[in-house]
Amino acid sequence: MKGPCEVQKNEDQEGEAAATGPQAETLEAERSWTADSHSALEAEGTHGLGERVMATLYLKSCRANSVVPVSCLLRQEGASELNLRHRGLGPQGVRALASVLTSNPYIKRLDLRDNGLCGAGAEALADVLRKNSIISDVDLSENQIGAAGLQAICTALALNPTVEKMQLQGNRLEEQAAQHLAALLLHHRGLKSLDLSYNQLNDLAGEILGPAVAENTGLTELNLSWNHLRGLGATAFARGLEANIFLKVLDISHNGFGDSGASAIGDALRVNNVLEELNMRNNRISVSGALKLGLGLQVNQTLRILIISKNPIRSDGCVGLLKSVRNNKSSALELLDVSDIQVSRECEDLASSMSEILPGLCIKRYTSRRKDWPQASTPSQPASAPSDSGL
């Protein structure tokens, strides 16, 4: 079965006959916009004139690329955000869009999620990001941009410090993309937030990204949830966290860090004095990994939120984490999420007692009780709807 990017290539080769429909719609859109713009131009003066020039340029580019214009772009009237998600633009549509985005002085946030950009569309947009000094927030999620498209985007961002937030969820990025991401982390000091969730970054990617995270000097929020980080790659990435002095929010949930990765995270927490929020939900961490993670919690003074729910750490692991926090007089922890973990009464009692010792700490727990325990001790939340928490 062909993917959207392969289908797009075939559609681009169908010839002029297939372009007749879009051409006609483009001309109709241009006539409609021209009629509406005259009165607006009289009211807006030179500001309206600038927008009219850009709109005219966009319409011409749409005709040249045989695509139907996006009406909301023609009527944006200096809006700071352009939301075109789920529009099916494809590479040709983005090429037409690039003509106006390059010199647009208004748009700060660009949302192109789920538009089938593929590599060619990403390359066209990269030229925009290279030249535009206004756009600071970009969402390119679910576009299958691939390694080649990512390389073009990362190269452009390295030359433009204006972009502070980039979302690249669900682009099927694999280990080949890791080297481009590492280069981005090393050379783009203006980037503050990067979302790489729902991709296919694996062990090798973790080994490449770890040193880059250690050297990064700007990123404050990183989302790597729902990837394939495990084994040596997860450990290498965790070690990179030790030297990082900027990252405040890290989401590595739904990976496979396991006990070795949890141990490395624990080591990082012993020396890292910047990280504030950490999500390790569903990472195959057992009792051993939880206890080693706890060693970091015994001395860490900055972590405010730790989510370790849905890991098989059992009661012993939960008790170990709770005792580590209790024994740290300088702990900044405000939320410890150990929900969806089967625990004993000892763990429940310890968690309850800690509310008196550390009133500022919220311990989130949904406890799957053993059948032979009294019904009266069953928590109020039903077993059929366990709590699901994320950063």
Swiss-Prot record:
Upper classification of the organism: Eukaryota, Metazoa, Chordata, Craniata, Vertebrata
Gene3D superfamilies cross-referenced by the UniProt entry: Ribonuclease Inhibitor
Keywords assigned: Leucine-rich repeat, Repeat
Organism name: Mus musculus
Biased composition (Basic and acidic residues): 28-38
Pfam families (UniProt xref): LRR_6
Region (Disordered): 1-38, 371-391
Bias type Low complexity, positions: 374-391
Gene expressing this chain: Lrrc74b
LRR repeat residues: 106-126, 134-154, 162-182, 190-211, 218-239, 246-259, 274-294, 302-323, 332-354
The protein, known as: Leucine-rich repeat-containing protein 74B
